[in-house]
Amino acid sequence: MSAIPAGLAIRFKRWEGNADLPVPAYATVGAAGFDLRAHVPDDAPIVLKPGARCMAPTGFSVAIPDGYEMQVRPRSGLALKNGVTVVNAPGTVDSDYRGQVCVLLINLGEEDFTIRRGDRIAQGVIAAAPQWPLVEVEDLDATERGAGGFGSTGV
């Protein structure tokens, strides 16, 4: 496990109406990501039709230290078993965002998928995100690869 800088923590603020949902947490000691759960009413689950997208709320806001981001990533089991994944994977939650964290999901499967209250819908991973100096130049350093892309180095 890599060292976390002293005094830094990820702080979650619970939104009203989700006292029954657990705070995001790591499922195992070695987990890189922590579970994000759906904050939808018990009587109004989200039914995600094949090919459809939705924005699923988590019921939490988050404070991330400057210089870091929270990446919102798919859950592999959801993708494998149901074809449900994060549309903009990885989604980015910036350190200065304080609104509710929502997850953009898409159903790539062939059957309806129902998202119920408390379902684990994605995982959050904290990653360094420094703001690098951005500099315009006339030319870039030459490389062996050059401008070749999209399969130019082999399949």
Swiss-Prot record:
SUPFAM superfamilies: dUTPase-like. Pfam families: dUTPase (PF00692). GO terms for molecular function: dUTP diphosphatase activity; magnesium ion binding. Its EC number is 3.6.1.23. Pathway: Pyrimidine metabolism; dUMP biosynthesis; dUMP from dCTP (dUTP route): step 2/2. GO terms for biological process: dUMP biosynthetic process; dUTP catabolic process. It is an enzyme of class 3 (hydrolase). Keywords: Hydrolase, Magnesium, Metal-binding, Nucleotide metabolism. It comes from the Bacteria. Its cofactor is Mg(2+). InterPro entries: dUTPase, dUTPase-like, dUTPase-like_sf, dUTPase_trimeric. It catalyses: dUTP + H2O = dUMP + diphosphate + H(+). CDD domains: trimeric_dUTPase. Substrate binds at residues 75-77, 88, 92-94. Belongs to the dUTPase family. This enzyme is involved in nucleotide metabolism: it produces dUMP, the immediate precursor of thymidine nucleotides and it decreases the intracellular concentration of dUTP so that uracil cannot be incorporated into DNA. This is Deoxyuridine 5'-triphosphate nucleotidohydrolase. The gene is dut.
